[in-house]
A protein has these predicted regions:
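Short beta-strand elements that form the blades of beta-propeller/WD-repeat-like
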Residues: 19-20, 64-71, 112-118, 155-165, ...
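Short coil/turn segments at the loop-to-beta-strand junctions that recur within blades
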Residues: 49-51, 90-98, 138-145, 187-192, ...
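Repeated scaffold domains used in trafficking and secretory/extracellular systems
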Residues: 54-58, 100-105, 142-151, 193-204, ...
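Asp-box/WD-like beta-propeller blade repeats and closely related beta-sheet repeat scaffolds
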Residues: 100-102, 117-169, 183-192
Length: 372
């Protein structure tokens, strides 16, 4: 990115400095290897016992554990980092410690806790790493869609939710018994009651609760924030100045340790009466120090230089993670081997992996930790 133009600069917004990027200045596309951002890549084969089988769902990683998210009929499942199945976490259902549709989850290895937040939740479900159901944490407001952080040592829970019209708060901090300690009213962040809208948090920087309230219906000018629970503030950090403010595209923002990243789409296309999909999506990256930026593509140079889809969403909770079924992994290897430019070492690595895969295997998980 050293040769990329300056596309953004910091501007003062009250007491805060916000990186303001100009959409019109984004031009060239750079291809960046995954190794530029991460330390190394592990490929973990998950335990293939019947009780360990998982779908191609979300995954949360810690130093020693892999938490595969639940999706009917499978509950959340906990593995060690070698892929050994340890236990189910909760169950699908409506009873104590059970859940159906889940919006967010956290794996807190240091405190022997797993937290699960269902859609439209009035409580945060709590488990230990042995699979035991613990007392839930009552929430002082119901959460249609929300992201959260738990400070168990400090006895605090921070929540940022999708603030539908009439919501008392967009963000708040409470204790573990549900008593509110501080909150922030929605104000201009209030969103229409449409479940197409989202709350996005990457949690890719230790100690930072980044938040993008993603409004699709309708779109609007907005910012990336950090939630400061101690002072009940959403602090703006980044925004994109759109070339045409009359037609704001679908878009999102995020941040990594040294970069802001984002995406925007061409106008939505109606694929069926009342059913819309976004047009072509563009992903961009901006250096936090220099303001230099460009459109970008991310490719997995640990794995045959295959391009990574949706690069601005490549990392979560400090990791690149891909949960992939064995058949899809075989297809990826076949596609990578078609590239005549990969090294002999890479070709051997891929063919050795290819030979070890059985179609009846459980899923494989690619894991690469973000550099600080």
């Amino acid at each position: 990115m050293a040769n990329s133009p300056i596309v953004g600069q910091y501007v003062q917004a009250g007491t805060d400095k916000v990186m303001s990027c100009d959409q019109k200045l984004l031009a060239d596309t750079v291809r960046i290897p995954l190794s530029f951002f991460t330390e190394k890549l592990e490929i973990v084969k998950l335990d293939s016992r019947d009780e360990a089988l998982v779908g191609q769902t979300g995954v949360t990683i810690s130093d020693n554990y892999i938490l595969v998210h639940g999706r009917r009929p499978n509950p959340f499942k906990l593995f060690d980092r070698r892929g050994n199945f340890l236990t189910n976490i909760g169950a699908i259902g409506q009873g104590p410690g059970e859940y159906q549709m889940v919006y967010d989850a956290k794996l807190d290895e240091a405190n022997n806790r797993i937290y699960i937040l269902p859609w439209n939740a009035s409580q945060l479900l709590v488990y230990d790493l042995q699979g035991n159901v613990l007392d839930p944490i009552p929430l002082c407001l119901r959460c249609p869609k929300a992201k959260f952080n738990v400070d168990l040592t400090g006895g605090k829970v921070s929540i940022v939710l999708l603030p539908f019209k009439g919501s008392a708060a967009v963000a708040w901090t409470q204790d573990l018994k549900g008593n509110r300690l501080g909150y922030m009213e929605p104000g201009h962040l209030e969103a229409p009651q449409d479940f197409s809208n989202e709350v996005i948090s990457g949690f890719n920087i230790p100690g930072t609760f980044d938040v993008n309230i993603l409004c699709i219906m309708p779109t609007r000018v907005d910012s990336l924030y950090r939630y400061d629970g101690d002072n009940s503030r959403l602090i703006p950090t980044f925004t994109l100045n759109f070339a045409n403010t009359d037609k704001i595209p679908w878009h999102g923002y995020g941040e990594w340790p040294h970069h802001f990243i984002g995406d925007f789409s061409e106008p939505p296309v109606e694929v069926a009466p009342g059913s819309w999909t976004n047009g072509k999506t563009f992903h961009y990256i901006v250096d936090k120090k220099t303001g230099k930026g460009s459109f970008f593509k991310l490719y997995n140079d640990y794995f045959g230089n295959l391009e990574i889809d949706y690069p601005s969403y490549a990392f979560s909770n400090g990791y690149y993670i891909r949960n992939i079924e064995p058949g899809n992994l075989m297809t990826d290897i076949e596609n990578a081997l078609k590239n005549q430019k990969i090294s002999d070492d890479m070709r051997k690595k891929l063919t050795d992996l290819q030979a070890s895969i059985d179609e009846n295997d459980n899923n494989y998980v690619m894991i690469a930790k973000l550099k600080p």
